[in-house]
């Protein structure tokens, strides 16, 4: 007879006491681990190549965390397979707070894009905080006779399939932003994938593509230099970085909203005290003038929300995008 069987045979109270003791012991182990954290260097994995918005904000966090927590935080770029390579690496990493994930809206797209995804976006991660949000910008070449969104839609309807939109790759945020725009405006746009957001913007400037739905941090300097013309932004409110540019909703498409964002995650099972420490520091960072100014340079709006709020946002975004992806028929597997 096992110990558990003997306890059970003796009556119900001892087994409840034993289970309670086990739970308390587990909580104690988590608290002890959290008190020692970090006891070595911490890796912030970003599943994209260096230079993009995710990488930029991961490095901002790494520098601040190194100063605050007394250990070296480094950024580890692990691009590939539509961001799933680096994301899966973190999902399979020890849940001790020494491997973190900094990623983007692709995190909420991938459950719909990859039927054979080898991790669960909700079950395998502990959301820490949405760091910033960034709008997408509908962009064209300034020399085109397109002054506003209505002009673009008019041309697209007059020439079905002849308006080419550049994206940063199949299944990317830029791809989905364009696909949703085509649905909402009842137009037929032709998708042209490129290797990254900067390449998509270059395609518009060279005339290879008509339009792009780029994230603002990639193209803000090009807009300011008047090398690209912004027609609209994808969020509900105008962005402070481009206050004179209307939203897509203002142009009459009330259901169009695409929220770009960058956020921090830990593997599921990471001690709550570690998650809370990271989240609290991000919230504090997002209120400092230096960080707010740095975010503004990238066209981003600081968020710094708590884990529970971030999780609610993630669930709502997955619920929104999965049926949209199914409707468009986009597949990347």
What are the roles of these predicted feature ranges?
Residues 39-41, 183-187, 250, 272-333:
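An extracytoplasmic/periplasmic, membrane-proximal ligand-sensing/linker region
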Residues 92-98, 112-199, 248-250, 261-294:
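Hinge/capping helix and adjacent helix->loop/strand transition within the periplasmic-binding protein
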Residues 28-34:
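Sec/Tat signal peptide C-region and signal peptidase I cleavage site
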């Amino acid at each position: 007879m096992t110990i558990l069987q003997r306890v059970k045979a003796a009556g119900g109270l001892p087994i409840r006491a034993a289970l309670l003791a086990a739970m308390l012991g587990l909580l104690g182990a988590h608290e002890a681990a959290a008190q020692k954290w970090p006891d070595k260097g911490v890796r912030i994995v970003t599943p994209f190549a260096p230079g993009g918005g995710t990488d930029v904000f991961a490095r901002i966090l790494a520098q601040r965390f190194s100063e605050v927590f007394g250990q070296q935080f480094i950024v580890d770029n692990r691009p590939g397979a539509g961001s799933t390579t680096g994301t899966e690496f973190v999902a399979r990493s020890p849940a001790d707070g020494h491997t973190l994930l900094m990623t983007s809206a692709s995190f909420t797209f991938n459950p719909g894009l990859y039927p054979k995804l080898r991790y669960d976006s909700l079950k395998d991660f502990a959301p820490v905080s949405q760091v910033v949000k960034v709008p997408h910008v509908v962009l064209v070449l300034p020399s085109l006779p397109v002054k506003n969104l209505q002009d673009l839609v008019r041309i697209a309807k007059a020439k079905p399939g002849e308006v080419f939109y550049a994206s940063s790759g199949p299944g990317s945020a830029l791809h989905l932003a364009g696909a949703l725009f085509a649905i909402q405006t009842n137009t037929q746009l032709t998708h042209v994938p490129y290797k990254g957001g900067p390449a998509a913007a270059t395609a518009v400037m060279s005339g290879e593509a008509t339009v792009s739905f780029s994230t603002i941090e990639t193209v803000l300097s090009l807009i300011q230099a008047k090398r690209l013309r912004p027609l609209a932004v994808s969020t509900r409110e105008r962005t402070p970085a481009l206050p004179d540019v209307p939203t897509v909703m203002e142009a009459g498409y009330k259901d169009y909203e695409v929220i770009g964002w960058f956020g921090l995650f830990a593997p599921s099972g990471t001690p709550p005290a570690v998650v809370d420490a990271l989240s609290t520091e991000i919230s504090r960072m997002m209120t400092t003038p230096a960080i707010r100014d740095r975010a503004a340079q990238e066209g981003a709006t600081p968020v710094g929300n708590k884990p529970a709020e971030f999780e609610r946002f993630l669930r709502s975004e997955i619920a929104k995008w999965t049926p949209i992806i199914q409707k468009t028929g986009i597949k990347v597997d």
